[in-house]
Each structure stands twice: as C-alpha cells, then as structure tokens.
Amino acid sequence: MARERPPGRGCGVLRRCLLGAVLLFGLRLCAELRRAGPGSPTRSAPPGPAWRPPGPHLPPAPGQPRGASRRQVTYVRSGRRAPPGGGGSGTPEPGCCAPRGRPRRKGPRWHIDLQPWAGSAQSLDEEAWRFLRYISTTQIACNHMNTDSLATDSSPTHKPWSVCLDDRFNLAHQIRNKQCRLYSLGLGSDDTHFEVSMANNGCEVHRFDPSVKSAHILESQHLWYHRLSIDWRDPHPAVAAQKPHSNTRKLGSILNEFGHHKIDVLKADLESAEWKVLENLILEDVLEQIGQLIFEIHLHWPGFEVSGSDSSVVRFWYSLLKELEQKDFRLFHSYKDLSKPQLFLKKDIFNASSCYTLSWVNTRWK
C-alpha cells in the first residue's frame, strides 16, 4: 500500500526552487552592475550635472574642498596646452590670453635649436669668427632706410636706429597712411629722437621704460610712455598676487593686454637683457607679429641668465640669430659702435666692439 506524502511537502520544494532562482538572478544582476562600472551610466546621461551613483559617498581628503580633485586635473591639462604668453602658471589674469578667434597654431617650445659647432675644436676663436662675420654681413639690400625723407624733424639721429622703407616691405606705406605701430623697449635712455621722429610721421609709438614716473603718459598725439619693463618671463604668480600692478611683463603678455596683434617696428636697447628677451620672442612665436626688428646687442659679457663656457655662449648667440633667419627675418643693416669699449666677453680680442646695432626685416610681413 503506497505511503501518503505529508501535507505541504511538495509546495516546500517548489518554494525552495523559486527562492534559489531569485537569488541566482540577483547575484548575476550585481555582477553585471559591477562589471559595467560607475562610469557607464554617464554615457547615456543627459547634459547637466555629472551623474553620481546613489548611496553614500566618500568625503574629500582633509584640507581638500569638494570637487577640487576634478578641477585640478582639468587645470593641469589645459595649462600644458595653454599658449605660452599666459605665463605658464597660476590662474590666468584678464588680458593674459590670446584674443578670441586667434588660436595658437603650435604648442610651446622650451629651448631653441642650437646650431652645430663652428669647428671640431669647439673653441672660442672658431665660434667668435663665425658669429662676428654673421652680424657684419647684411643678408638683404635695403635702398631706403630711416625716416629722413618723411620726417618733419631734420636733425640727425643720435643712434643708427635704421628701418627699411622699401615699398616691398610695406612700412613706408603704413607710415604714409598713419597706420604704423612702433614698440620701443628701453631702460632709462634719454635718446628718444627715433621715437619722436616716428610719432611725428603719424606712427602710434609706445615706449616702455620702468623709470617713467607715471603708469601711462601721453606725451604727444601719437607718443605714449608706459612704466613697464619687458622681460623674458612674467612675474611669479605669488609675486603677482601680492603686486597686481607689477611693472614687469613679457612682450606677448603686453600685446594681449593692449589688444595689439601687430607691431610694425620693435626697437630694443635692453642693456644685455636682449638675448633672453629675443629667445622668448622666438620660443613663443611672437616674432610672427613683428615687421622689423632693431636690436642693440652687447658682447662684453654673456648677458643676463646666459651661462657656460665662452665658446658655448657665442654658439648660443649665433643660434638665436639663425632662428631669426629661419623665421624669414633678414639682416639689412649692421652698425659697429666704435665709441663703446672694444671688448668681446671681457677680452680685447677679434677687433670687436662691445656693442652693435642690428636691423632685420620680416620678408613675409604684410
């Protein structure tokens, strides 16, 4: 005779099967969620605040404000790609960045390309002769120099600050149309005949001199004086925060602050700071905004923050000038100042002067 099952036993087995199936489904669902990760929901999330998974969240590290980690990562990345004119560190100040609609074409360069040694001996004699020959040999002919034919003031200039007025380089046309702009970088020089002459011819002239008493002075209709010193670096952010009106800037920063995109003529007499300033103009592609360069160079010592053996210093100088040539600047005038000490790196050698005035024209300038 068959045994009867206890009441409800079959239902119990069924319940256990159902519970097991539910448990298995739950475990699988958890595994899928873990595999997907917290970032996957953001792919389909609508625009707006970032999606955050429900539940408790870890607090930020001690001393770190909420959301700071995300902002810091974004800042570092954008800082590396930022144009070098912004100073390279710290929160950008108003006017420090390139104008809208004018994106930088290249990333920043950190050093110039050194030219090969002049000879296998890597000696001072080899480097000096190559350099002196280079600065004494013009690369392009200019038939009309200076502003004598246009100037209302016929007195002779005190120094040979020569500009090229050949029609093919457009400066004479800009002067006649009162549309030229001159930047003059100096350190307390009383010789302003060149600036006054250019202003009298209708050029917009900005002279930067840290010895000026007021921040900005309008000397005449077209001549401005600014109490600013052009450097090869912007002030450190900590210093800038304490002195928001610091009078030291890179030329690229000045251009951005003034809203100027082009300089027809850049004249510089920086008393041995010219090498580092020129290096900065090269590395940050500011040269593309300049039509003609007139630099007084000093050779009696290496210059500010230029170091190394004598031969390596001269090689650095030569490499800077070759960078100008590679950017389509051509030397059209060279003046050897015999009134200055005849010294070359503190030595009376090579029949060299300690001071030369060199003028270049940007052959691609329009």
Swiss-Prot record:
Q: Where is the composition biased (Pro residues)?
A: 44-63
Composition bias (Low complexity) maps to 91-100
Q: Which GO terms describe its molecular function?
A: methyltransferase activity
- Region feature Disordered, mapped onto this chain: 36-110
A Gene Ontology biological process noted in the UniProt record is: methylation
Q: Which interval of the chain is the signal sequence?
A: 1-29
Q: Which InterPro entries match?
A: Methyltranfer_dom, METTL24
Q: What is this protein called?
A: Probable methyltransferase-like protein 24
Please report the organism this UniProt entry assigns to the protein.
Homo sapiens (Human)
Which lineage? Answer: Eukaryota, Metazoa, Chordata, Craniata, Vertebrata
Gene from which this protein is expressed = METTL24
